[in-house]
Amino acid sequence: MTQILIVEDEQNLARFLELELTHENYNVDTEYDGQDGLDKALSHYYDLIILDLMLPSINGLEICRKIRQQQSTPIIIITAKSDTYDKVAGLDYGADDYIVKPFDIEELLARIRAILRRQPQKDIIDVNGTLLKVTVNGAEIELTKTEYDLLYLLAENKNHVMQREQILNHVWGYNSEVETNVVDVYIRYLRNKLKPYDRDKMIETVRGVGYVIR
């Protein structure tokens, strides 16, 4: 499901947008404070961010700039500022679109659909076997060596169910004396680290057999 973050301090408008977007089958998070919104944007995976400019703690332009330093998540600015200077500044700071309040909800929904259509289809996760790192939407996830080896094995065998014994042999070694339940423990570790990016469900359990990434 498409993940959208709303950062808007006008609570009535924010709730209205959340209701409308949820009705359109988007999964929505909402923050009313600029710093809270920035923290959420940088720590979770989102397909699109709807961002007001005039916010408590930190303004929308600064949020946009900081997000662009780390990731390329599409951003739509919604604001009462209608001057050409403000529009140019918003786009130059990294926004993908700029809508002046008040606006028609149907126009916003159409712009969201248009931006999402333009986004390239990416693998939900990038497991780099050369650099030994894992990124989701440009954000690097810290993993232990064992966690990385386990995720890399599953990613390299995408759509192929890996038995617990196979995983144990590849990750821990054929002569390892650890029990197969250690695989379940490390799968749980991985899911917990992927959960903030809404990627924990990418590792599926095949009951009585093992695990697979679809």
Curated annotation (Swiss-Prot):
It is found in: Cytoplasm. Keywords: Activator, Cytoplasm, DNA-binding, Phosphoprotein, Repressor, Transcription, Transcription regulation, Two-component regulatory system, Virulence. InterPro entries: CheY-like_superfamily, OmpR/PhoB-type_DNA-bd, Sig_transdc_resp-reg_C-effctor, Sig_transdc_resp-reg_receiver, WalR-like, WH-like_DNA-bd_sf. GO terms for cellular component: cytosol; protein-DNA complex. The modification 4-aspartylphosphate is found at residue 52. The keyword Transcription applies. GO terms for biological process: regulation of DNA-templated transcription. Its main location: cytoplasm. The keyword Metal-binding does not apply. Residues 113-214 bind DNA. Member of the two-component regulatory system ArlS/ArlR involved in the regulation of adhesion, autolysis, multidrug resistance and virulence. This is Response regulator ArlR. It comes from Staphylococcus aureus (strain N315).
